[in-house]
């Protein structure tokens, strides 16, 4: 639903009949979903008169995305209830969180999100604001992903069916083992005529059996689907010839050199985990039934700004974070801001492990096999700002746990939060969840 700039029929959404029903049965689902999806601190629905909203935002007219004056961590997004091209009411809400202002400059993403929410709040309105708990749950997630992942608008119902199918595959096994698989949803399959293996008989996602799904691993090979979820064959991605193994990893995963706009990838990554991504690195992942939006540029920029490291180092760190997550390895990576022996010793116990005469380096591909093994071992790996490993394993000193440090559910999270008093600590759980700690802040990736 495109944003309509005109005076709404109702000046305050709260004056609509039964809107309180949404506040009671749909508001929590709506706010919780957006908070988790965008990794935000808070979502607030701005229930006020239109003139009050304009005064608060210091604007003469309402736009889809607006800055909140005097707040460095808030923006206001406006969806709308529109029926038969008649604007009934604006639905404004505030997004609060770190770096949320970035969406003011890349507003196409938030615009598409706002459009998807407009569709859902209008549906809720047409049902007398009943059913908000399911309208703004998993259904909203699938509509938003379908809306935001591509410049082309896809059929939300067919896309939701594709997601449901991939979720089923993510929880199934072939010959007793979980297996990855994937598809490229494409507007024109002739764009992939090189390295394309055509079926004798066209398939549909509902007629493909498990043995056939096993043929495309979602890494090198992908089913090509049209907008009706039909497939005529499998595409084999091109082989990159580059010595930059970190860059190769990201280019391979997002098919940077193969995927054509407005096409996108849907794949299973591991047990109960799916991913929807484009060639730019925009990605929606569902891990443990929670949808999250992420972009590798955002998290690498965060590390660069917090630690003063190079982007090359930040991408190498992210490389190992993602390897642990996708291989379901529980681990902690710690990058101290102050890498002095005194600073590290102050937060760790005496049983620090240093194995080699020369330091391992996360930027060196030949060291990868050893680093992978170390990450799967007990304790936290300590990485310097230059990418060299300072200690293969350390343990957070819980005896000095101050009252200001919140006790967390898992000892690994507690350790990561303690270590993050100096720099950044990343906790990867066995279920694939990634949590990044910096000071008192926790960010999901």
Q: Where are the regions a protein language model picked out?
A:
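Divalent-cation
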Residues: 2-445
């Amino acid at each position: 639903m495109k944003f309509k700039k005109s005076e709404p029929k109702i000046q305050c959404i709260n004056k609509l009949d039964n809107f309180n029903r949404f506040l009671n049965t749909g508001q929590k689902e709506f706010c919780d979903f957006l908070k988790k999806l965008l990794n935000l601190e808070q979502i607030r629905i701005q229930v006020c008169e239109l003139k009050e909203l304009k005064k608060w935002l210091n604007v003469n007219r309402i736009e889809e995305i607006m800055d909140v004056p005097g707040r460095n961590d808030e923006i206001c997004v406006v969806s709308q209830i529109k029926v038969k091209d008649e604007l009934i009411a604006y639905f404004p809400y505030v997004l609060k969180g770190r770096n949320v202002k970035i969406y003011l400059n890349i507003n196409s993403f938030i615009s598409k999100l706002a459009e998807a929410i407009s569709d859902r709040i209008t549906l809720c309105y047409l049902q007398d604001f009943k059913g908000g708990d399911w309208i703004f749950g998993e259904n909203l997630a699938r509509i938003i992903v379908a809306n935001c992942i591509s410049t082309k608008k896809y059929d939300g119902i067919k896309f939701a069916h594709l997601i449901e199918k991939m979720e089923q595959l993510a929880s199934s096994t072939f010959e007793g083992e979980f297996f990855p698989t994937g598809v490229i949803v494409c507007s024109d399959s002739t764009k992939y005529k090189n390295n394309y293996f055509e079926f004798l008989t066209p398939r549909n996602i509902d007629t493909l059996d498990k043995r056939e799904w096993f043929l495309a691993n979602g890494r090198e090979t992908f089913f090509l689907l049209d907008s009706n979820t039909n497939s005529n064959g499998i595409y084999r991605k091109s082989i990159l010839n580059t010595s930059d193994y970190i860059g190769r990893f990201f280019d391979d995963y997002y098919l940077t050199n193969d995927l054509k706009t407005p096409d996108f990838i849907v794949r299973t990554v591991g047990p109960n985990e799916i991913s929807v991504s484009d060639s730019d690195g925009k990605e929606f992942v569902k891990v443990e039934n929670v949808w999250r939006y992420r972009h590798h540029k955002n998290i690498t920029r965060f590390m660069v700004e917090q630690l003063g490291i190079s982007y090359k180092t930040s991408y190498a760190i992210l490389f190992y974070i993602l390897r642990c997550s996708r291989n379901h390895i529980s681990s902690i990576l710690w990058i101290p801001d102050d890498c002095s022996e005194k600073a590290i010793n102050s937060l760790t116990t005496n049983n620090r492990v240093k194995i080699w005469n020369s330091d391992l380096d996360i930027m060196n591909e030949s060291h990868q096999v050893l680093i992978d093994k170390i990450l799967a071992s007990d304790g936290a790996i300590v990485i310097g700002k230059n990418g060299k490993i300072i200690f293969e394993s350390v343990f957070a000193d819980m005896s000095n746990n101050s009252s200001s440090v919140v006790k967390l559910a898992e000892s690994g999270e507690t350790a990561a939060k303690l270590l993050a008093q100096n720099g950044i600590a990343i906790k990867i759980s066995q279920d694939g969840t990634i949590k990044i700690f910096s000071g008192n802040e926790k960010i999901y990736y």
